[in-house]
Design a protein with these regions (language model features):
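A generic secondary-structure signal for well-formed alpha-helical elements
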Residues: 6-10, 15, 19, 55, ...
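Short amphipathic alpha-helical coiled-coil/interface segments
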Residues: 151-155, 160-175
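Ligand/substrate-recognition segments at binding pockets and active sites
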Residues: 53-120, 160
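Pocket-flanking alpha-helical
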Residues: 10-15, 100-133, 174
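Hydrophobic, well-ordered secondary-structure elements that form the walls
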Residues: 2, 65, 85, 106, ...
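Short, solvent-exposed loop/beta-turn-alpha elements that line the ligand-binding surface or hinge
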Residues: 28, 32-49, 57-60, 105-109, ...
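Short, solvent-exposed turn/loop segments enriched in Gly/Ser/Thr/Pro and often Arg
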Residues: 18-21, 118-119, 184-189
Length: 203
């Protein structure tokens, strides 16, 4: 429901000036193992609110979202998430912490929501570490091993075709079950001097 309530496109358009893409799962669309058949949740706050009401969600509670200090895009993303969730009646309090403290709070379950980011690795198995039960990097504290096992099966295969089938199933399970909400994949921007020779330029 929260995934439907958050307007990710606004984050890409306003905070990144279009230099990014809305995330469906842990892999961006240009990743060689991205599943082209993924069906993302569409932004639909009315449907999100209905889902929460049907599930008996507690709208009276104020939920704590913790955010790392110093990353402007991430801090602004937190404000947009807060606004989007308040539109469907979910009260969110934002607190910022240094990165070490934030990670420890997540590991100890001292927050309802946490905002983190990471790079996109060419290894499709890289994202599964945050889904491994009892791992220190499992910040959402998920106990079900199904997602980690799906990714691990892909890592055990030899050919790209075999691995692709496993990682497609892995991504589809993540989109269906939503143990995490992936917000966006931000483009890497590089600046260089025009005095450098043999550098391909878009202009």
């Amino acid at each position: 429901a929260f995934d439907k309530a958050i307007n990710k496109q606004v984050m890409v358009d306003q905070l990144m000036l279009g230099e990014g893409q809305v995330a469906v799962g842990p892999m961006p669309k240009y990743h060689p193992y991205y599943d082209e058949n993924l069906k993302p949740n569409t932004y639909d706050p009315e449907a999100a609110e209905t889902m929460l009401k049907e599930a008996g969600f507690n709208f009276d509670k104020e939920y704590l979202m913790i955010v790392p200090k110093g990353n402007q895009v991430r801090e602004q993303s937190a404000l947009l998430i807060q606004q989007d969730l308040e539109k469907i009646g979910v009260k969110v309090k934002i607190e910022t912490y240094d990165f070490t403290t934030l990670l420890q709070m997540l590991r100890e379950g001292k927050a309802d929501l946490g905002l983190l980011g990471g790079g996109s690795n060419i290894d499709p198995n890289e994202s599964s570490v945050i889904l491994k039960p009892n791992d220190a990097r499992n910040y959402s504290l998920v106990k079900d091993p199904k997602w980690f096992d799906l990714a691990n099966e892909g890592a055990s295969k030899v050919t790209k075709e075999e691995r692709k089938k496993c990682y497609d199933a892995y991504q589809e399970a993540l989109v269906e079950d939503q143990p995490y909400i992936w917000l966006y994949h931000q483009n890497d921007l590089w600046a260089y001097s025009k005095r450098l020779a043999e550098v391909p330029r878009s202009e």
